[in-house]
Amino acid sequence: MKERGLLIVLSGPSGVGKGTVRQALFAQEDTKFEYSISVTTRKPRQGERDGVDYFFKTREEFEEMIENNKLLEWAEYVGNYYGTPVDYVEQTLESGRDVFLEIEVQGALQVRKAFPEGLFIFLAPPSLAELKNRIVTRGTETEATIENRMKAAKEEIELMDAYDYVVENDSIELACERIKAIVLAEHLRRDRVAPRYKKMLEVE
Protein backbone atom coordinates (compact mmCIF):
# COMPACT_ATOMS: atom_id res chain seq x y z
CA MET A 1 0.00 0.00 0.00
CA LYS A 2 1.75 3.14 -1.24
CA GLU A 3 1.62 6.07 1.16
CA ARG A 4 0.31 9.24 -0.46
CA GLY A 5 2.83 12.06 -0.56
CA LEU A 6 2.71 15.08 1.72
CA LEU A 7 1.82 18.52 0.44
CA ILE A 8 4.31 20.82 2.21
CA VAL A 9 3.43 24.51 2.04
CA LEU A 10 6.06 27.07 3.03
CA SER A 11 4.97 30.68 3.12
CA GLY A 12 5.54 33.91 4.97
CA PRO A 13 5.87 37.64 4.35
CA SER A 14 7.74 39.07 1.37
CA GLY A 15 11.46 39.39 2.12
CA VAL A 16 11.52 36.70 4.82
CA GLY A 17 13.71 34.46 2.66
CA LYS A 18 11.28 31.82 1.37
CA GLY A 19 13.13 31.42 -1.91
CA THR A 20 16.55 31.32 -0.26
CA VAL A 21 15.46 28.66 2.25
CA ARG A 22 13.79 26.61 -0.50
CA GLN A 23 16.95 26.72 -2.63
CA ALA A 24 19.10 25.71 0.35
CA LEU A 25 16.76 22.81 1.15
CA PHE A 26 16.81 21.51 -2.40
CA ALA A 27 20.60 21.78 -2.59
CA GLN A 28 20.89 19.14 0.16
CA GLU A 29 21.34 15.56 -1.03
CA ASP A 30 18.90 14.07 1.48
CA THR A 31 16.02 16.33 0.39
CA LYS A 32 13.44 14.20 -1.40
CA PHE A 33 10.77 16.84 -2.14
CA GLU A 34 9.37 17.63 -5.57
CA TYR A 35 9.26 21.40 -6.05
CA SER A 36 6.05 22.75 -7.53
CA ILE A 37 6.96 25.79 -9.60
CA SER A 38 4.53 28.68 -9.25
CA VAL A 39 3.06 30.69 -12.10
CA THR A 40 3.40 34.49 -11.89
CA THR A 41 2.84 37.65 -13.94
CA ARG A 42 5.62 39.60 -12.22
CA LYS A 43 8.80 40.45 -14.10
CA PRO A 44 11.75 38.06 -13.55
CA ARG A 45 14.38 39.23 -11.06
CA GLN A 46 18.05 39.01 -12.01
CA GLY A 47 19.12 35.38 -12.35
CA GLU A 48 15.57 33.94 -12.34
CA ARG A 49 14.75 31.51 -15.15
CA ASP A 50 11.40 30.66 -16.69
CA GLY A 51 10.38 27.08 -15.89
CA VAL A 52 12.99 26.83 -13.12
CA ASP A 53 12.18 29.54 -10.57
CA TYR A 54 8.70 30.44 -11.89
CA PHE A 55 6.56 30.06 -14.97
CA PHE A 56 6.37 33.68 -16.14
CA LYS A 57 3.03 34.48 -17.84
CA THR A 58 1.17 37.52 -19.12
CA ARG A 59 -1.97 38.64 -17.26
CA GLU A 60 -4.07 37.33 -20.16
CA GLU A 61 -2.45 33.88 -20.01
CA PHE A 62 -2.85 33.74 -16.23
CA GLU A 63 -6.53 34.74 -16.34
CA GLU A 64 -7.13 32.00 -18.92
CA MET A 65 -5.64 29.47 -16.46
CA ILE A 66 -8.04 30.74 -13.76
CA GLU A 67 -11.04 30.35 -16.08
CA ASN A 68 -10.00 26.80 -17.00
CA ASN A 69 -9.50 25.76 -13.33
CA LYS A 70 -5.83 25.00 -13.96
CA LEU A 71 -4.68 26.52 -10.65
CA LEU A 72 -4.82 24.99 -7.17
CA GLU A 73 -4.64 28.51 -5.77
CA TRP A 74 -3.96 31.98 -7.01
CA ALA A 75 -3.63 35.43 -5.53
CA GLU A 76 -2.91 38.98 -6.58
CA TYR A 77 -0.09 40.51 -4.56
CA VAL A 78 1.31 44.04 -5.02
CA GLY A 79 -0.13 44.21 -8.54
CA ASN A 80 0.98 40.76 -9.74
CA TYR A 81 -0.70 37.34 -9.96
CA TYR A 82 0.81 34.21 -8.38
CA GLY A 83 -0.61 30.68 -8.62
CA THR A 84 0.03 26.92 -8.35
CA PRO A 85 -0.68 24.53 -11.27
CA VAL A 86 -3.09 21.86 -9.98
CA ASP A 87 -2.39 18.84 -12.23
CA TYR A 88 1.27 18.54 -11.28
CA VAL A 89 0.50 18.64 -7.54
CA GLU A 90 -2.19 15.95 -7.61
CA GLN A 91 -0.24 13.55 -9.83
CA THR A 92 2.91 13.85 -7.71
CA LEU A 93 1.08 13.23 -4.42
CA GLU A 94 -0.63 10.16 -5.87
CA SER A 95 2.76 8.75 -6.89
CA GLY A 96 3.83 8.85 -3.22
CA ARG A 97 6.22 11.79 -3.53
CA ASP A 98 6.12 14.92 -1.37
CA VAL A 99 5.31 18.20 -3.08
CA PHE A 100 6.90 21.39 -1.77
CA LEU A 101 5.12 24.69 -2.40
CA GLU A 102 6.76 28.04 -1.70
CA ILE A 103 3.93 30.54 -2.02
CA GLU A 104 2.49 33.82 -0.75
CA VAL A 105 0.31 33.84 2.38
CA GLN A 106 -2.95 34.51 0.49
CA GLY A 107 -2.29 31.48 -1.68
CA ALA A 108 -1.43 29.28 1.31
CA LEU A 109 -4.80 30.08 2.90
CA GLN A 110 -6.58 28.97 -0.29
CA VAL A 111 -4.59 25.72 -0.36
CA ARG A 112 -5.52 25.14 3.30
CA LYS A 113 -9.21 25.08 2.27
CA ALA A 114 -8.61 22.77 -0.70
CA PHE A 115 -6.01 20.52 1.04
CA PRO A 116 -6.66 20.64 4.81
CA GLU A 117 -4.42 17.57 5.21
CA GLY A 118 -1.43 19.54 3.91
CA LEU A 119 1.51 20.55 6.10
CA PHE A 120 1.58 24.34 6.51
CA ILE A 121 4.79 26.04 7.69
CA PHE A 122 5.04 29.79 8.32
CA LEU A 123 8.53 31.21 7.81
CA ALA A 124 8.90 34.14 10.21
CA PRO A 125 11.51 36.92 10.32
CA PRO A 126 13.60 37.47 13.47
CA SER A 127 12.12 41.00 13.62
CA LEU A 128 10.29 43.55 11.44
CA ALA A 129 13.46 45.66 11.29
CA GLU A 130 15.41 42.71 9.87
CA LEU A 131 12.60 42.01 7.40
CA LYS A 132 12.71 45.60 6.09
CA ASN A 133 16.50 45.41 5.85
CA ARG A 134 16.27 42.27 3.68
CA ILE A 135 13.77 43.91 1.31
CA VAL A 136 15.88 47.08 1.03
CA THR A 137 19.07 45.03 0.45
CA ARG A 138 17.49 43.38 -2.60
CA GLY A 139 17.83 46.74 -4.34
CA THR A 140 14.90 45.94 -6.64
CA GLU A 141 12.08 47.79 -4.86
CA THR A 142 11.06 51.46 -4.79
CA GLU A 143 10.45 53.19 -1.45
CA ALA A 144 6.68 53.04 -2.04
CA THR A 145 6.84 49.30 -2.81
CA ILE A 146 8.92 48.68 0.32
CA GLU A 147 6.30 50.44 2.46
CA ASN A 148 3.52 48.42 0.78
CA ARG A 149 5.40 45.18 1.42
CA MET A 150 5.98 46.07 5.09
CA LYS A 151 2.29 46.88 5.56
CA ALA A 152 1.36 43.56 3.92
CA ALA A 153 3.95 41.72 6.05
CA LYS A 154 2.39 42.93 9.31
CA GLU A 155 -1.03 41.74 8.13
CA GLU A 156 0.42 38.37 7.06
CA ILE A 157 2.18 37.77 10.38
CA GLU A 158 -1.22 38.16 12.06
CA LEU A 159 -2.45 35.19 9.95
CA MET A 160 0.11 32.87 11.54
CA ASP A 161 -2.67 31.01 13.41
CA ALA A 162 -3.75 29.34 10.14
CA TYR A 163 -0.47 27.36 10.03
CA ASP A 164 0.63 24.12 11.69
CA TYR A 165 4.22 25.20 12.42
CA VAL A 166 6.26 28.40 12.66
CA VAL A 167 9.95 28.40 11.71
CA GLU A 168 12.04 31.50 12.40
CA ASN A 169 14.49 32.28 9.62
CA ASP A 170 17.30 33.56 11.84
CA SER A 171 19.73 31.25 10.02
CA ILE A 172 19.18 29.55 6.66
CA GLU A 173 20.90 26.36 7.83
CA LEU A 174 18.81 26.14 11.02
CA ALA A 175 15.58 26.94 9.16
CA CYS A 176 16.28 24.06 6.75
CA GLU A 177 16.98 21.63 9.61
CA ARG A 178 13.76 22.63 11.38
CA ILE A 179 11.69 22.14 8.23
CA LYS A 180 13.22 18.69 7.60
CA ALA A 181 12.51 17.68 11.21
CA ILE A 182 8.87 18.76 10.85
CA VAL A 183 8.42 16.76 7.63
CA LEU A 184 10.03 13.65 9.14
CA ALA A 185 7.74 13.83 12.17
CA GLU A 186 4.66 14.24 9.96
CA HIS A 187 5.56 11.11 7.98
CA LEU A 188 5.64 9.16 11.27
CA ARG A 189 2.21 10.28 12.49
CA ARG A 190 0.07 7.34 13.53
CA ASP A 191 -2.83 8.31 11.25
CA ARG A 192 -0.48 8.18 8.24
CA VAL A 193 1.34 4.90 8.99
CA ALA A 194 -1.38 2.86 10.74
CA PRO A 195 -3.30 1.94 7.53
CA ARG A 196 -0.15 0.34 6.09
CA TYR A 197 0.33 -1.85 9.17
CA LYS A 198 -3.35 -2.78 9.32
CA LYS A 199 -3.14 -3.85 5.68
CA MET A 200 -0.10 -5.97 6.55
CA LEU A 201 -2.06 -7.72 9.32
CA GLU A 202 -4.88 -8.53 6.90
CA VAL A 203 -2.41 -10.28 4.58
CA GLU A 204 -0.97 -12.31 7.47
Curated annotation (Swiss-Prot):
Residue span(s) of domain Guanylate kinase-like: 5-184
Binding-site list for ATP: 12-19
Protein name: Guanylate kinase
PANTHER family xref list: GUANYLATE KINASE, GUANYLATE KINASE-RELATED
Organism: Bacillus licheniformis (strain ATCC 14580 / DSM 13 / JCM 2505 / CCUG 7422 / NBRC 12200 / NCIMB 9375 / NCTC 10341 / NRRL NRS-1264 / Gibson 46)
EC class (word): transferase
Molecular function GO labels: ATP binding; guanylate kinase activity
One protein family per Pfam: Guanylate_kin
GO cellular component, one term: cytosol
Location in the cell: Cytoplasm
SMART domains tied to this protein: GuKc
CDD domains per record: GMPK
Reactions catalysed: GMP + ATP = GDP + ADP
Record's keyword terms, sorted: ATP-binding, Cytoplasm, Kinase, Nucleotide-binding, Transferase
Signal peptide: none
Described function: Essential for recycling GMP and indirectly, cGMP.
Gene3D superfamilies from the UniProt entry: Guanylate Kinase phosphate binding domain (3.30.63.10), P-loop containing nucleotide triphosphate hydrolases (3.40.50.300)
Family: Belongs to the guanylate kinase family.
Primary localisation category: cytoplasm
E.C. number(s) listed in UniProt: 2.7.4.8
